[in-house]
Amino acid sequence: WFNRTSENGVSFYNPYESWTYSTKTLPMYNTKTPYTELAYFGTIFANAQKESDNLHILTTQNIFTELNFTSENDRFGGDGIMQSEKNTNKSIVTSFNYLGKRYMMHTGYIHNKVIRKENGGTSDNSMVRDTTLDAREYPINLNNASTDLIRNTFFLDQQYRIPFTFIRNIKDRKIDKAFKDSLLASGDTARIDSLDVFLARRRAAREAADTLGDNNITTAFIGHSSEYSVFRKTYADQITDAAGKAFYNDVFNYNPTTSFDSVRVMKLENRVFLRLQPWSDDAIVSKLNGGIGNR
């Protein structure tokens, strides 16, 4: 837990990253037929004060062979163990991805909202040791406090593949020329008469070949990646009782009964990169990368 890494680099949002998606973890789909998931799971037989309920809705389909659309809605919620621990975590995701022979693109929108009640812990630690008490009976420091977190992310990743087919074409022309020269030198008139047809078939086969999966050709990739994210956290409370005032050492600089604090982080990233694959993708030197960006 303490060694976890942050996808977004926003400290107050780190604990919630595993409950939603990032631009790196958002799954992209490619389906032959429309696909939908509906799921509900929770502790339906638990006490109503402590039950949790979770909802998952996913739908995805290919608009065209290369273009896919996906929408997902997730909700995680629970009332907690002690008083004022109710928590709701909602995520809404919309994404498109395009997978062509030369061009590839991923784009989407990620929305995450967390509404969390705050109790400040129990005001009497000795009651925790009393096993006859239910956790709901523990006195708490804050009776009317909450924290809201909202995150909105727009992202676009795209790249264009440029296979250096001219190198292979030069090799193929040399092979064709060598075959033609050897055949002419043999003097076989029947095979010489069909030479043009044979070479035409070879050229047609090469032109019709799908180079998307050809990993053994020198290739360049030009790509662009961008992300715009806004993270906002707000804390609000109303404190009129002695326990709540003691929790904050009775220090209220602006309002003696009400607090409202907020923080906002905006992240804008743009990156352009160039990747060169000199030989095959599993060679000793498989990729050479370079790029620039701003954040």
Residue ranges and their predicted role:
Residues S6-S11, L26-I44, F69, A220-Y228, ...:
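Transmembrane beta-strand segments of Gram-negative outer membrane beta-barrel proteins
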Residues T122-A135, Q238-T258:
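Surface-exposed loop/turn segments flanking beta-strands in extracellular/periplasmic regions
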Residues E17-S22, Y29-G80, N87-I92:
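Outer-membrane beta-barrel translocator/receptor signature
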